[in-house]
Amino acid sequence: MKTKFILLVALFALVSTSTVSAQFYNRKKVAITEVVDKSGDVAPGTKTFIRSALTDAITNSDGYEGYASISFLSFEVNFDKTGNVSSAMLTYVKKQLMEYILVSEVTPLDKKTVLLSARIVNTSNGKIVASSSVRTYADIDYLRSACNSLAYNLVGAI
């Protein structure tokens, strides 16, 4: 009886560990780039906050890991000017074993509101797999909620 109990506990521990490991290793890796501001009117701190909030929202979504890396800097300099994902950037992200790249843009609509747009691009083929946008007040208190909503719309599509 005691042997059966020990075997049952060991089996349960093995199944629990493999389930947790599978959930951990099956997470989709998303590289999150700098926020594009084609107008040049958005404060750098606001763009950093938006990127941070999107990284948090993606990372806190079940099945996803968000990555923001300083090593993207050289690519982001060119990316900030165009808003396009170059083949060099896709190749670099693939080498880092990232499945997706999140590209975001903030556009001032007036003095109080902005449009946050984002798309998730598959690094293996360059296809946009999800795209969404949200209009919000350009205030920190509203931006986090808008980023959470944006991330929810994006990860629900892949």
For the regions a language model picked out, list residue spans one by one:
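Short, Lys/Arg-enriched, disordered terminal segments
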Residues: 1-5, 22-23
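N-terminal segment of the mature soluble domain
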Residues: 27-32, 41-84
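C-terminal/domain-edge helix-coil "capping" segments
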Residues: 22-31, 46, 57, 92-95, ...
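Hydrophobic alpha-helical membrane-insertion segments, chiefly the h-region
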Residues: 17-21
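Short, solvent-exposed, polar/charged sequence segments at loop or secondary-structure edges
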Residues: 61-103, 109-115
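Residue-level signal for short, function-critical loop segments
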Residues: 36-38
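Conserved beta-strand segments of the P-loop GTPase G domain that flank and frequently precede/overlap
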Residues: 33-34, 104
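Sec-dependent N-terminal signal peptides
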Residues: 4-15
